[in-house]
Amino acid sequence: MLDSKLKAPVFTVRTQGREYGEFVLEPLERGFGVTLGNPLRRILLSSIPGTAVTSVYIEDVLHEFSTIPGVKEDVVEIILNLKELVVRFLNPSLQTVTLLLKAEGPKEVKARDFLPVADVEIMNPDLHIATLEEGGRLNMEVRVDRGVGYVPAEKHGIKDRINAIPVDAVFSPVRRVAFQVEDTRLGQRTDLDKLTLRIWTDGSVTPLEALNQAVEILREHLTYFSNPQAAAVAAPEEAKEPEAPPEQEEELDLPLEELGLSTRVLHSLKEEGIESVRALLALNLKDLKNIPGIGERSLEEIKEALEKKGFTLKE
């Protein structure tokens, strides 16, 4: 039983960085550490929106299995490097951007070589993309989108221009989440929980921002249980039993003895509290089979007796 006198839990930010955060919530009633920690972990890993590369266009490249003269890496390696690109959209309404890169060798091409774009920040500018030899050139356009979860290349189908290569997109900015539940005490009570959450992100979203978003997502979904209007919209209509014809309505309340059943069958039904035709018709064949003493022959006897009165058992 929940203790109404237990003071409100205290939320503490133990560690907060751009890519790692540790948070503590205590004291909690016994069991609530796991009750809160597990869904928050799942939401953090699956449902926090982020950004990812969704397509790549490279000048003079027809497909991802090509090679580029004067470039050490093949196209597959370049795309794998680009998938590690971490981009932060500073404008919440921004949904997609195209990053442009033009480079000539000899040169090590890094993420910092993309041309600047308003409201866009590259979080890992030292990311290696390609190595150009003397005379090598690399001109590319990289599309970055905002999204949620994992979307394979064939699903999002983004192809802004001919020869653009779609890329599998992992949008989640949360790299890893761990939670730990430990015993804690408050006064004389020693049976309380302390929940510790550790969150790692790619830096495009801070751990605290990710946690706040996860809490809002969980809160929003929990309101569906307490909002009667939402429940009324979502709930399917209850199936209504067809009304019996007026001439049969009176017979529904007849005692079972009026059906002319054998003493053995009648006794088995009455042992289960079935006293009337109406109560018998509320059961289906499976229900009747589960009654001790009611076998296949007894079922046939019951069905025939009901049919004589114009009734049929539910399957």
Swiss-Prot record:
Alphabetized Pfam families for the sequence: RNA_pol_A_bac (PF01000), RNA_pol_A_CTD (PF03118), RNA_pol_L (PF01193)
Broad enzyme group: transferase
Stretches the record annotates as Alpha C-terminal domain (alpha-CTD): 247-315
Listed EC numbers: 2.7.7.6
Superkingdom of this protein's organism: Bacteria
Region (Alpha N-terminal domain (alpha-NTD)): 1-229
One GO CC term, this protein: cytoplasm
Protein name: DNA-directed RNA polymerase subunit alpha
Species per Swiss-Prot/TrEMBL record: Thermus thermophilus (strain ATCC 27634 / DSM 579 / HB8)
